[in-house]
């Protein structure tokens, strides 16, 4: 024994610096049990015996911490785990951190490892036949008694894996009952606010429809979950669905699982009417219209001793119990009699609808009233093709009803905004007031009393007037003149003056707009000179403040810690002069170039303002990020499956690791949906998700409207516009705005692709280093994944090149539209587009 331990210690010393997996392989060799019978019991003390070599941890804790570690490689963990299972066959039955060990695999979404263990058969003859993962025998939590299908762990992907691992086990899982409250999984799905959604019932049914060979595991209806089972409070799944007005669940229960909606003198319909569950009332009406079997014989035509072929109750017994009026009868083709309710129950639950007395098949008039239940579908393998055709017709009827229950899809076209002269500055003044309000708080926090904020426009100096406009109410007038809308005009004036007084008290230069005159007076002089010595205009001041507040203040905390040292990612707040020059260039030199007459562009043919683009149309292909970058860091994720999941959910994620420096915070470039597999890791202060902010079409449209407003004002200030130039028509403005929005979204696409290329390149460099250091074989799965990532990088490089070329084409088209067709300076348009592109790229 001493020699054995000495060799083991020597082996561990040689391996401890090489591989964490090999160390645990030694643990398994040191911990092989001596008594076979004890190993078959998960409560045995063998599984809780501490091992001194590993800080007195038992084998369950060691294996649990190992496979659940985020650094565990899912491609290499399977072999040592199988070696442990050969000697500890029920180790995944044992409790680890208050839950069975196999439940943690689901909770952490280690689907690849779970699928391998589900199909693994123990080779050791002593333990052959023991189930490694007892998902269909034991609950996931002994305190709540819930099975896997009753918990939030039952995702669509998990159900697909379980079905592939054996339909018999899956059916056993469906039939599991929570002994705490006497419920099955249908009770959990029927409740709208439960952990499992009602759509899970539909997915399970469709899995059975796609795999009819599971009929060999069904002997009768008792081997299928009971849709009429009552819980400890006497509630059936249909009762719970009606209480929640969950119409989808009720439809699935009746049509797919054979819930008896017709029993107890239509008690379900009465309950739905009392609870005002209007959606469920429609479902019950649909069931009565399509699935109810009407009597074909009057009760007074029956003999007193006529007996039902299903429940064996005679007409005389029905009269004695007072059920003559509530129960109706149906005469079969074989001249036997059955209660209509009994026949409907048989049609819902039975696979072969036959007379129970003589086993003669029922006619088509009965089969056409049978719901397309799962149990009946599985038993159709033994029936004729004619029965299959009737079943498919009823199933299509069910799908049509399901589609009819969906809320109507309403497509709201973009609002057509007409910029009248009196309202042209509405948005700019409103946003400027918000900037002024934020300026007070910022100056107070930083103690800066000399900040320059050109808030509003002066009412004195050289003036020009805009045409007045009739207003129907005070709200319209307040919006047009940029005033806060209050019914009490005096209160509105006091609020505005208090804001100006606070700014003046802080030493901030304040200019006041004359709001009393419906003819607005806009000053072109008396503009406060900036500290940078460059002349400002009101529009340039507004753009400068917008960029300053939205760009610099939001990204100055976006720093990372590399090797313990804080490194700023992008600290542009120290170079405000460059930003001011960029903002000023948006307005300069609009009237210095000559124009030649060129045929105008047909806006309607280029862009459809009523079309709402989807994600791919707006942002390009979703393949611009590499989800497999976290395969080895997060553990137990199938690269190819996660790649498909990414393409469906549009998830963007990147992560880089280094052997010399440990990166504690990495930038995350977001998609429209976040997968729970990927966690954002950031340090410092949190900042807004500017990607999602810019993707909102309303925000992009704000920038586009400001773009058009600046160009339109430049034309209005020209004394002698070119003869060929067409004025801004109200009908063309919304189309121009949408065209610029499209340009903004292409800017975002290109910026995201550039960031993704950078992160992927870092990951590929890191993995190339690991491949050489670990001396991995060319056939190793890690090398194959690296090769795939390099191919994806090449594909993304081509995509970003095409995006950049498309962006250049759109830039030239916009310059042509504004310069040649509308008379705006080409240099000014170029600067406008350049600042928008820089703005989008900075916020990514």
Curated annotation (Swiss-Prot):
Pathway it works in: Protein modification; protein ubiquitination
Zinc fingers, RING-type class: 308-359
Example of a GO biological process term: symbiont-mediated perturbation of host ubiquitin-like protein modification
Catalytic reaction list: S-ubiquitinyl-[E2 ubiquitin-conjugating enzyme]-L-cysteine + [acceptor protein]-L-lysine = [E2 ubiquitin-conjugating enzyme]-L-cysteine + N(6)-ubiquitinyl-[acceptor protein]-L-lysine
Top-level taxonomic group: Viruses
SUPFAM superfamilies reported in the protein's UniProt record: RING/U-box
Positions with a binding annotation for ATP: 229-236
Keyword set, alphabetical order: ATP-binding, Host-virus interaction, Metal-binding, Modulation of host ubiquitin pathway by viral E3 ligase, Modulation of host ubiquitin pathway by virus, Nucleotide-binding, Transferase, Ubl conjugation pathway, Zinc, Zinc-finger
KO phenotype (gene knockout): Reduction of host mortality.
Disulfide cross-links: none
GO molecular function, one term: ATP binding
Entry EC number(s): 2.3.2.27
InterPro entries according to UniProt: Znf_RING (IPR001841), Znf_RING/FYVE/PHD (IPR013083)
Subunit structure: Interacts with host UBE2E1/UBCH6; this interaction results in WSV222 auto-ubiquitination. Interacts with host tumor suppressor-like protein.
Function: Probable E3 ubiquitin-protein ligase which accepts ubiquitin from the E2 ubiquitin-conjugating enzyme UBE2E1/UBCH6 in the form of a thioester and then directly transfers the ubiquitin to targeted substrates. Mediates ubiquitination of host tumor-suppressor-like protein (TSL) targeting it for degradation. Might function as an anti-apoptosis protein by counteracting TSL-induced apoptosis.
Protein's UniProt name: RING finger containing E3 ubiquitin-protein ligase WSV222
Organism in which the protein naturally occurs: White spot syndrome virus (isolate Shrimp/China/Tongan/1996)
């Amino acid at each position: 024994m001493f020699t054995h331990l000495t060799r083991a210690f020597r082996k561990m010393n040689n391996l401890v610096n090489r591989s964490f997996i090999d160390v645990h392989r030694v643990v398994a060799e040191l911990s092989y049990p001596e008594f076979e019978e004890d190993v078959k019991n998960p409560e045995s003390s063998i599984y809780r015996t501490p091992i001194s070599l590993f800080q007195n941890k038992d084998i369950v804790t060691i294996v649990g911490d190992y496979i659940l570690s985020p650094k565990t490689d899912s491609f290499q963990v399977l072999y040592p785990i199988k070696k442990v299972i050969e000697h500890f066959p029920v180790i995944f039955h044992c409790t680890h951190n208050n839950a069975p060990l196999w439940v943690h695999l689901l909770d952490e979404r280690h689907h690849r490892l779970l699928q391998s263990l589900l199909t693994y058969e123990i080779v050791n003859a002593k333990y052959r036949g023991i189930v490694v993962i007892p998902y269909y025998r034991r609950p996931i939590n002994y305190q709540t008694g819930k099975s896997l299908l009753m918990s939030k762990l039952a995702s669509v992907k998990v159900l697909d894996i379980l079905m592939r691992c054996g339909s018999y086990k899956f059916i056993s899982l469906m039939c599991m009952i929570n002994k705490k409250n006497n419920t099955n999984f249908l009770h959990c799905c029927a409740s709208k606010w439960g952990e499992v959604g009602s759509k899970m019932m539909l997915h399970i049914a469709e899995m059975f429809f796609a795999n009819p060979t599971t009929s060999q595991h069904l002997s009768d209806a008792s081997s299928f979950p009971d849709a009429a089972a009552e819980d400890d409070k006497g509630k059936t799944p249909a009762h719970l669905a009606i209480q929640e007005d969950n119409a989808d669940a009720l439809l699935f229960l009746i049509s797919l699982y054979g819930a008896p909606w017709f029993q107890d003198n239509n008690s379900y319909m009465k309950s739905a009417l009392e609870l005002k569950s209007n959606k469920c009332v429609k479902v019950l009406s649909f069931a009565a219209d399509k699935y109810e079997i009407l009597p074909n014989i009057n009760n007074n035509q029956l003999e007193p001793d006529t007996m039902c072929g299903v429940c064996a109750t005679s007409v005389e017994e029905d009269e004695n119990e007072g059920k003559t009026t509530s129960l109706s009868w149906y005469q079969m083709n074989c001249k036997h009699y059955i209660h209509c309710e009994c026949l409907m129950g048989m049609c819902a639950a039975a696979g072969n609808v036959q007379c129970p007395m003589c086993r003669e098949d029922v006619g088509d008039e009965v089969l056409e009233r049978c719901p397309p239940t799962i149990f009946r579908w599985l038993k159709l393998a033994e029936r004729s093709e004619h029965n299959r055709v009737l079943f498919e017709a009823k199933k299509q009827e069910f799908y049509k009803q399901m589609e009819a229950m969906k809320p109507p899809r309403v497509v709201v076209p973009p609002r057509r905004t007409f910029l009248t002269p009196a309202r042209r500055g509405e948005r700019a003044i409103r946003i400027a007031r918000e900037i002024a309000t934020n300026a007070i708080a910022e100056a107070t926090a930083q103690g800066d009393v000399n900040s320059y904020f050109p808030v509003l426009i002066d009412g004195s100096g050289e003036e020009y007037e805009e045409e007045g406009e009739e207003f129907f109410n005070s709200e319209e007038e307040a919006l047009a003149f940029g005033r806060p809308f209050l019914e009490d005009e005096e209160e509105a004036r006091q609020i505005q003056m208090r804001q100006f007084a606070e700014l003046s008290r802080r030493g901030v230069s304040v200019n006041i707009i004359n709001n009393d005159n419906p003819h607005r007076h806009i000053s072109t002089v008396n503009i406060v000179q900036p500290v940078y010595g460059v002349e400002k205009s009101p529009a340039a001041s507004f753009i400068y403040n917008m960029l300053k507040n939205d760009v610099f203040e939001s990204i100055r905390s976006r720093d990372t810690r590399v090797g313990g040292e804080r490194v700023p990612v992008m600290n542009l707040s120290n170079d405000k002069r460059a930003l001011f020059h960029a903002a000023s260039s948006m307005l300069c030199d609009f009237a210095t170039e000559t124009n030649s007459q060129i045929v105008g562009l047909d806006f309607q043919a280029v862009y459809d303002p009523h079309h709402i683009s989807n994600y791919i149309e707006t942002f390009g292909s979703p393949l611009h990020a590499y989800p497999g970058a976290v395969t080895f860091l997060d553990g137990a994720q199938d690269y190819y499956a996660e790649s498909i999941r990414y393409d469906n959910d549009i998830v963007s994620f990147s992560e880089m690791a280094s052997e010399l420096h440990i990166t504690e915070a990495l930038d995350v470039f977001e998609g429209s949906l976040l997968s729970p597999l990927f966690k954002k890791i950031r340090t410092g202060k949190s900042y807004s998700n500017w990607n999602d902010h810019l993707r909102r079409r309303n925000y992009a449209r704000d920038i586009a409207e400001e773009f058009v407003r600046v160009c339109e004002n430049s034309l209005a200030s020209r004394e002698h516009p070119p003869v060929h130039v067409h004025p801004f028509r109200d009908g063309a403005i919304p189309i121009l705005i949408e065209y610029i929005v499209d340009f903004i979204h292409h800017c975002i696409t290109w910026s995201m692709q550039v960031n993704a290329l950078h992160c992927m390149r870092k990951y590929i460099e890191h993995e190339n280093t690991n491949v050489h250091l670990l001396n991995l074989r060319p056939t190793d799965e890690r090398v194959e994944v690296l090769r795939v990532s390099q191919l994806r990088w090449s594909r993304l490089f081509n995509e970003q090149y095409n995006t950049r070329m498309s962006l250049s084409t759109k830039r030239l088209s916009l310059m042509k539209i504004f310069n040649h067709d509308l008379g705006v300076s080409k240099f000014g348009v170029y600067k406008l587009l350049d600042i928008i592109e820089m703005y989008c790229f900075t916020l990514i």
